[in-house]
UniProtKB/Swiss-Prot annotation:
Signal sequence bounds: none
Domain called Response regulatory: residue spans: 5-122
InterPro entries: CheB-like, CheB_C, CheY-like_superfamily, Sig_transdc_resp-reg_Me-estase, Sig_transdc_resp-reg_receiver
Gene: cheB
Name the record gives this protein: Protein-glutamate methylesterase/protein-glutamine glutaminase
The EC number(s) this enzyme carries: 3.1.1.61, 3.5.1.44
Top-level taxon of the source organism: Bacteria
PTM sites of type 4-aspartylphosphate: D56
Taxonomic source organism: Bordetella parapertussis (strain 12822 / ATCC BAA-587 / NCTC 13253)
Function: Involved in chemotaxis. Part of a chemotaxis signal transduction system that modulates chemotaxis in response to various stimuli. Catalyzes the demethylation of specific methylglutamate residues introduced into the chemoreceptors (methyl-accepting chemotaxis proteins or MCP) by CheR. Also mediates the irreversible deamidation of specific glutamine residues to glutamic acid.
GO MF term set: phosphorelay response regulator activity; protein-glutamate methylesterase activity; protein-glutamine glutaminase activity
Amino acid sequence: MKKIKVLCVDDSALVRGLMTEIINSHPDMEVVATAPDPLVARELIKKHNPDVLTLDVEMPRMDGLDFLEKLMRLRPMPVVMVSSLTERGGEITLRALELGAIDFVTKPKLGIRDGLIEYSEVIADKIRAASRARLRAPAPAGHAAPLRLRSPFASSEKLVIVGASTGGTEAIREVLQPLPADSPAILITQHMPAGFTRSFAQRLDALCAVTVREASDGERVLPGHVYLAPGGETHMRLGRSGANYVIGLQASEPVNRHRPSVDVLFHSAAEAAGGNAIGVILTGMGKDGAAGLLAMKRAGARTMAQDEASCVVFGMPREAIALGAADEVMPLADISERILTRLGDRGHRV
């Protein structure tokens, strides 16, 4: 079996050693070299031609973002960012994903050894996914505003429910940016750690006509608003309070190894919204969301899955399609317009 060749770039000798230990403990991958900074890494990339690069965000001589930008322009390859679990780390990591990084892992603030070892399987899964991922062009600087679509109508009864993982931050941006300000409410679960989703919501809010915010427990769901599940600590559910939809955040065990889980959101939407919802599953590894999307379909919702050609990682959509959970499969570029078309359809299903 051909092993996945990994180059680890980090200014911390401790982190380089731990990443090497973790990666080499898996039989399908190996660290072929490590580098303390991007300038050394540049020569090692030429020498070893790695399949995946793990790249620290903040380093001396040249920071990770500058190096990533040059790398994706001159020699594109799958990159997994290694970021500190801080608000600043979150903002930098989101920019790295815009520049073309496939995914990221977080370094704990304290107890780095125990923290990284604890996430050994997650790190290995992300490297495997990156090795198979489709590279995409970096997002243009400033994100030129797309042509806004027209909403067929705004109704407090209609909802769009979205789930995503690896590659999802850019996919979500592409879905939301064309939507008009009077779009129905949208609830999104994107796999992210605590502290990152607020920065993500703020970035989206600055780019979109709809209002994007990190969801709060108990808040009423309003048209023209997008609610992003807070990362890491709770699951987001859709519920009812009289005639209104409300958001519930629940601190319970991970589902499908994730918290927040897409399945939890989708199952709650099936129960609370039934045929008034549209369910959308986007790029991501694993199977989270597949069973929940099927539950939404059985409850009367219209359901959509991103197609293989436009996914960074065709995992979650593949599982949903295999279950028969998706009414339609389409390229990412078509999803926004299709959502609004479905919202304008008459009948018992959205």
